[in-house]
Amino acid sequence: MAVDERLRDKLHDQLFQAILELRSLDECYEFFEDICTIQEMRAISSRLEVARMLAAGDIYEDIVKKTGASTATISRIKRCLNFGSGGYRKILGRMAQKDPHFLEVKKEKRK
């Protein structure tokens, strides 16, 4: 799928090129700690987890409980998974290739 051309510009290219230069998990932490607030990082991480849970077949109720994401955010991410540019699916697929259990529904243990 095509990327929205309204996003393509020199500043976005520069950011993405910088991200592509990161060589380790530690470098990612260092860079993103500098470039994002903790809240922004939590929001980005939460969106990826919502996408993973949707792709795994989790239901909205479980996703809300685990991530704290609103149903509006979950719906938007689901729309992106189904009709977006394919970025979520591409990354989730690659992560699942490295970890066969990545897209399994992870049930919380009840006390």
Name what the model sees in each region:
Residues 1-22:
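General nucleic-acid-binding
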Residues 62-67, 74:
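Short alpha-helical "recognition helix" segments of helix-turn-helix
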Residues 79-94:
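Short, solvent-exposed alpha-helical "recognition" segments
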Residues 91-111:
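Intrinsically disordered, low-complexity basic tails/linkers immediately adjacent to helix-turn-helix/homeobox/MYB/SANT
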